[in-house]
Amino acid sequence: IGMETGGDQDPFNSTLERTAREIHENYQKSSPKAPSWERLSEFKRNSNRHAVLHVEIKRAVWRKQGTRTKEEILGHLTRSEHMRWMAFNTMDGWRYAPIEEQDPDHRLHPCLRPFNELNMHDKRKDAENVFHALELPIETSIPEIADSSLER
């Protein structure tokens, strides 16, 4: 799933690339074995680029909290982030496989399943993506949020 932009001189392209790199660098903080941006496949780079396009949606939802609590909104956005990620991958032919059968060459990934079936580590990755998109500090309460509002 490619991203066509107007080339290196296009301001959208440079902002998109810079922010996609930032998203990946944020991911590397919780997954130190993740490769550098330069070593990512084009598919993984495009995954980060598509995540950038969803940032404004997350921010709009965050601004319009209404009567819902911060934890409820963060839970909703975290579940939505996981669904966005799953949609991107399944549209490219990826399928679920247990962790012991994970195989990028055959497009098999253990996180391609409903959010409530993920372990806390994988839920936290989705929550950290949301916190990063909203420019909120990564809070130590992410597991608490996950326990209370992400299980619905």
Where are the regions that the model predicts?
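Alpha-helical propensity feature that highlights long, continuous alpha-helices across diverse contexts
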Residues: 1-152
